[in-house]
């Protein structure tokens, strides 16, 4: 039996909710409501809150970012970008009968959104807006929502005992694109009070949120230990007067619910990465949350984040067995003295150093590797083939390489001029406790690889990957629920291990098609291009070192205030040098062709997923002004992380630009592509 399009079970639940609404609706005369974290349930998987929308806007406008947006030379681009953002936003908000413009007119206080999994595998979206002082605008918005829903052929549902504040619409069923899939049931509900508006795609959740606006609920998000730990740690770092953005997510919980609520339009073969992470112990990460503020304490932007991942019961919080299975690789011991090495060039765009227990990571990766490939024993097979295959390097990877590495991993980033699709450069430097052994292992491995050629860079022996293809490299990126094909299985094929290694190598070549490798300065150096490796090896240190740069020193001093003791990560970046490659590619309309790691990731996320295709650029950058005219708006950034009993605490800041002159990006001495 159905009642106006709603089944009896759902109607009974709604009636129960509405009964509580009738009792609790009298609160509305009193005005504002408790913080949204006391309104939304403990089953909230993701949450975003802006307690002071006006204050946030004012603070943003005072930052260099706000000044950039207001720069007259940026007007054409900003207007076009806002139009596009509005269109993209409408595709999502339209499901609730809203637009981005709507959200800018009605808030008088907090605006919060939540993704709620009240029923396993069903993700609901609820938006809560404090409309204090904007009651007329809120009423007009509700009328517009109703008009838009009716234009989409929605039907208003009438349920007995429902208070007049809540309205429910049933939308026509929507096919998800699969011929064998049933049409999706869609509803929109909204409730309006004198000082609040609640909108969502689940009438029960909207009704419950509205019903508890007076006092909050006992089973609220604040009863989630991960939420209270993360927001408790980070919230005390930035006062409410700074108009912060607050956020929280249960990463695996959200991913699983999103996956179940949004099945792929096409059936995909291969591993389910969300399920794999859960199986491999990464569900030890219970939640991630933090706060972000603009124009606070002399910083253009300030952020604090806690990854809540306490040790499993009975485990040592800082030991290698803190977690199970592959999650044991998440071991980042704190240390003192993290700073740029003398050989890090002064003009770099960015530097990041991470303390990582690589030995534990290596011994933990086996089960994850096998799970992703889809065949138990594959990792051991690959390791054995490296040692025993007569055509291979015949090395013991654990003994000859991993055991000779330290715990410091450093990333250097920069770019070369003129800016093109292959301008960005990176160097990954891994500390070597026994450089001679690492160098010998690298030489033996490279000599057995026909795709690597030996080169000489000054007094250093290095190896460079021979680029045999001009094809645009791509990274396969999967959204939650997505998958890539498993490695082919060749039952009875003696060459199966070789085939697996070859496939892995092909992926490496796509990622870094011009890579060069050497051992120098007590590190294994892996460079994206030969020219950046040459620059690092030739750097004399001293005044030419990043550590000697004035902007690094001032930014490092700010980071030291955030992390005065030991840390597992320290990072420095120059916003202008970091942003410039992407900025110029946007101006050229060439971002989809970018060969940088970031560009490939972006293209993988935004592309159609079909191999060999180049996505259409989503943002029109043709109206952007010359970069030099806006460089002054970009300053420096810093980031730190420390390992705690609760997980990992991170904090960082963006500093306004000083009077420093930009470090000049060095043009490659070799032809493009090196």
Where are these regions (language model features)?
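Bacterial N-terminal signal peptides
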Residues: 15-26
């Amino acid at each position: 039996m159905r009642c106006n399009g709603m089944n009896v079970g759902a109607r009974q639940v709604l009636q129960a909710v509405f009964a509580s609404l009738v009792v609790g609706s009298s609160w509305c005369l009193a005005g504002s409501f408790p913080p949204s974290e006391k309104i939304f349930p403990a089953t909230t998987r993701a949450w975003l809150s802006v307690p002071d929308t006006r204050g946030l806007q004012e603070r943003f406008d005072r930052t260099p970012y706000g000044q950039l947006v207001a720069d007259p030379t940026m007007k054409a681009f900003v207007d076009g970008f806002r139009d596009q953002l509005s269109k993209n936003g409408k595709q999502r908000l339209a499901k609730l009968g809203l637009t981005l413009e709507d959200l800018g007119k009605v808030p008088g206080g907090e605006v919060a959104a939540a993704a709620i999994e009240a029923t396993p595998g069903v993700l609901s979206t609820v938006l809560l807006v404090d409309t204090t002082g904007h009651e007329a605008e809120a009423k007009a918005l509700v009328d517009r929502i109703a008009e838009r829903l009716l234009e989409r052929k929605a039907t208003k549902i009438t349920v007995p005992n429902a208070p007049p504040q809540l309205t429910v619409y049933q939308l026509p069923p929507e096919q998800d694109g699969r011929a064998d899939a049933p049409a999706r049931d869609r509803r929109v509900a909204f409730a309006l009070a004198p000082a609040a508006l609640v909108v969502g795609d689940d009438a029960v959740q909207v009704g419950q949120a509205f019903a508890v606006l007076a006092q909050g609920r006992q089973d609220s998000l604040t009863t989630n230990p991960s939420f209270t730990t993360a927001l408790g740690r980070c919230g005390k770092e930035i006062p409410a007067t700074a108009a912060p953005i607050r956020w929280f997510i249960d990463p695996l919980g959200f991913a699983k619910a999103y996956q179940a609520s949004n099945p792929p339009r096409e059936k995909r073969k291969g591993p389910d990465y969300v399920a794999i992470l859960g199986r491999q112990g990464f569900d030890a990460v219970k939640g991630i949350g933090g706060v972000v503020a603009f124009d606070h304490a002399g910083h253009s932007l300030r952020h604090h984040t806690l990854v809540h991942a306490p040790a499993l019961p009975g485990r040592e919080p800082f030991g290698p067995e803190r977690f199970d299975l592959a999650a044991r690789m998440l071991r980042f011991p704190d240390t003192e003295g993290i700073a740029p090495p003398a050989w890090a060039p002064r003009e770099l765009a960015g530097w990041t150093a991470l303390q990582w227990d690589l030995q534990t990571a290596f011994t933990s990766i086996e089960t994850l590797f096998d799970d992703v490939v889809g065949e138990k024993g594959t990792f051991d097979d690959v390791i054995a083939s490296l040692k025993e295959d007569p055509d291979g390097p015949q090395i013991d990877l654990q003994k000859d390489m991993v055991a000779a590495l330290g715990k410091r991993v450093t990333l250097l980033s920069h770019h070369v001029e003129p800016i093109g699709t292959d301008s960005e450069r990176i160097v990954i430097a891994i500390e070597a406790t026994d450089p001679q052994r690492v160098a010998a292992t690298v030489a033996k491995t490279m000599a057995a690889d026909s795709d690597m050629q030996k080169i000489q860079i000054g007094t250093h022996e290095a190896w460079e990957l021979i680029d045999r293809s001009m094809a645009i490299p791509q990274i396969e990126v999967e959204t939650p629920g997505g998958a890539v094909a498993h490695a082919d299985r060749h039952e009875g094929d003696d060459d199966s291990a070789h085939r697996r290694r070859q496939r892995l190598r092909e992926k490496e070549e796509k990622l870094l098609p011009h890579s060069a490798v050497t051992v120098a300065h007590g590190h294994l150096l892996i460079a994206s291009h030969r020219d950046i490796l040459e620059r690092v090896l030739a750097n004399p240190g001293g005044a030419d070192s990043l550590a000697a740069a004035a902007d690094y020193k001032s930014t490092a001093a700010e980071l030291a205030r955030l992390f005065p003791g030991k840390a597992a990560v320290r990072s420095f970046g120059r916003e202008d040098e970091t942003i410039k490659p992407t900025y110029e590619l946007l101006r050229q309309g060439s971002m989809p062709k970018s060969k940088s790691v970031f560009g490939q990731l972006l293209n993988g996320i935004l592309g159609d997923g079909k191999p060999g295709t180049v996505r259409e650029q989503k943002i029109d950058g043709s109206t952007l002004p010359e970069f030099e005219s806006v460089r002054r708006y970009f300053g420096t950034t810093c980031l730190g992380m420390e390992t705690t009993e609760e997980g990992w605490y991170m904090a960082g800041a963006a500093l306004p630009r000083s009077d420093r002159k930009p470090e000049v990006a060095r043009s490659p001495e070799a032809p493009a592509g090196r």
